[in-house]
């Protein structure tokens, strides 16, 4: 097993210097830290977790609370991608992840906070939960460092997608493609939905596009059946939309199924757009027009900022980080000549 002494000998520095470099002390230059860390990795050094825990009074374990209303779990493409980048960034700083749940030893039920304390989590990442639930509030308001994803809660650390700008970019693109009859099937009530819906109406007003009430419908996120039923209603209108925006890419697949069952072609007969930019959307034929969320940076920033707060609680900033998405034009929004818009 490689020791600090072995690394010190290779780097021609003291054991104390190696220890400081590996523990990110401020009194060593970044250049020297980098050199020592690279050498340690090259030599296959792995710190003794028990010794490190005793020394730092930390478990090097971060809890993840993820309980979306539809119970999708890790089949939730968007949050699975966010979690993956969070995991990579956390592991790069030697932290493990454990899911927060209500199960305890001997089958005894625990609250989220009780489970977090039982596991000794250094911090918690909270994503896709209902903040009106008492147990969620209890955990979020505790003294355990917390970062929330896509939700701003009190003075807690938060990393959020710019949903308002994302919807503005998506709507504007559809408008520039000649569409004026634009419908929106939005998700159920949440901070994300509120931001997107406000931006949808705001962008329409700015561009002079009238949105009839019957053009706006609601379904659950990732609900292909609900999205399909809403699509049926929109297509049955006396003056149907020329483009439908779905709450997310997965829900859009439900709309695609209904449209094709009617013998209609996308985008020749009806244009559609999704939201999220999941990998599967780029495999459809034609490729789905969508707003790609930057899951890589959402997860990475959340992990890095949470760990900074864990390790440097007196100096780490408890701020809100906004991550921009990017329009993927795809092939499902037809360029209109003006006669159909």
Region locations from a protein language model:
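Alpha-helical recognition/docking segments in bacterial nutrient-uptake
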Residues: 2, 57, 61-172, 176, ...
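Small/polar loops that bind or transfer phosphate-bearing groups
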Residues: 20, 101, 127-128, 219, ...
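Short gly/ser/thr-rich secondary-structure transition/capping motifs
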Residues: 42-48, 105-108, 129, 256
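N-terminal helix-turn-helix DNA-binding module of bacterial transcription factors
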Residues: 1-60, 339-340
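Bacterial carbohydrate/catabolite-sensing allosteric modules
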Residues: 42, 85-95, 141-148, 152-341
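Residues at alpha-helix caps and immediate loop-helix transition turns in enzyme cores, especially N-
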Residues: 32, 75-78, 135-138, 193-196, ...
């Amino acid at each position: 097993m490689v020791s600090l002494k072995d690394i010190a000998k290779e780097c021609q520095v003291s054991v104390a210097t190696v220890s400081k470099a590996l523990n990110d002390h401020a009194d060593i230059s970044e250049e020297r830290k980098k050199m020592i860390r690279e050498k340690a990795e090259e030599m296959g050094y792995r710190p003794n977790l028990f010794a490190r825990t005793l020394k730092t009074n930390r478990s090097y374990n971060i809890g993840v609370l993820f309980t979306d209303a539809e119970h999708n779990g890790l089949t939730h493409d968007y949050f699975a991608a966010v979690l993956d980048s969070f995991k990579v960034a956390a592991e790069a700083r030697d932290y493990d992840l454990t899911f927060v749940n209500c199960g305890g030893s001997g089958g005894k039920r625990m609250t989220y906070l009780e489970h977090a304390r039982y596991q000794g989590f250094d911090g918690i990442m909270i994503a896709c939960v209902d903040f009106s639930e008492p147990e969620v509030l209890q955990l979020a308001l505790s003294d355990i460092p917390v970062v929330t994803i896509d939700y701003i809660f009190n003075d807690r650390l938060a990393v959020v997608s710019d949903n308002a700008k994302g919807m503005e970019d998506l709507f504007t693109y559809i408008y520039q493609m000649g569409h004026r009859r634009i419908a929106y099937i939005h998700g159920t009530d949440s901070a994300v939905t509120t931001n997107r819906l406000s931006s949808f109406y705001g962008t329409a007003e700015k561009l002079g596009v009238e949105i009839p009430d019957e053009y706006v419908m609601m379904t659950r996120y990732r609900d292909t059946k609900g999205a399909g039923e809403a699509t049926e209603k929109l297509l049955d209108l006396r003056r149907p939309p020329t483009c439908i925006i779905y709450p997310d890419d997965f829900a859009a697949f439900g709309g695609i199924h209904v449209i094709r069952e009617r013998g209609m072609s996308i985008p020749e007969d009806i244009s559609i757009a999704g939201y999220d930019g999941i990998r599967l959307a780029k495999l459809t034929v034609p490729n789905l027009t969508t707003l790609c969320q930057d899951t890589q940076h959402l997860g990475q920033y959340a992990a890095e900022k949470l760990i900074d707060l864990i390790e440097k609680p007196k100096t780490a900033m408890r701020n809100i980080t906004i991550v921009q998405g990017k329009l993927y034009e795809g092939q499902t929004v037809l360029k209109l000549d003006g006669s159909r818009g």
